[in-house]
Design a protein with these regions (language model features):
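Glycine-centered, phosphate/nucleic-acid-interacting loop/turn motifs that mediate DNA/RNA or nucleotide
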Residues: 59
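Amphipathic alpha-helical dimerization/coiled-coil segments
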Residues: 1-7, 25, 80-109
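N-terminal helix-turn-helix DNA-binding core of bacterial DNA-binding proteins
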Residues: 2, 6-46, 66-80, 84
Length: 109
């Protein structure tokens, strides 16, 4: 089992590419075959397959084979490490922003 930091890094790396983010966003609306994604994004089939492999390696998507086609869909649990990371820092920043607001109010008096 990989560490939380390793999982976060894989997700950040996978979503750093605009094409992969667009593919991931498209898959949030439903399952799609590689050929459908190729047509939708005007990207070569090998490039789409490579992007999907990266997303799959990060745990963000899963694929199922049906005949010669592979259909991909979002893995809902795949984004959890990123959600946990954001939640941790959200608490940190909320606390610090609140302190800053209090300081600014004191300075205005």
């Amino acid at each position: 089992m990989q560490s939380a930091a390793a999982a976060e890094n894989k997700i950040f790396q996978a979503l750093a590419d605009p094409s992969r983010r667009a593919i991931f966003e498209s898959l949030t609306r439903g399952e799609a075959a590689v050929k459908d994604l190729t047509a939708r994004f005007d990207i070569s089939q090998p490039a789409v397959s490579q992007h999907l492999a990266t997303l799959k390696d990060a745990g963000l998507v899963n694929g199922r084979r049906e005949g010669r086609c592979v259909y991909y869909r979002v893995e809902p649990r795949g984004i959890k490490p990123l959600i946990d990371w954001i939640a941790h820092y959200r608490a940190f920043w909320t606390e610090h922003v609140d302190r800053l607001e209090q300081l600014l109010e004191k300075m205005d008096r």
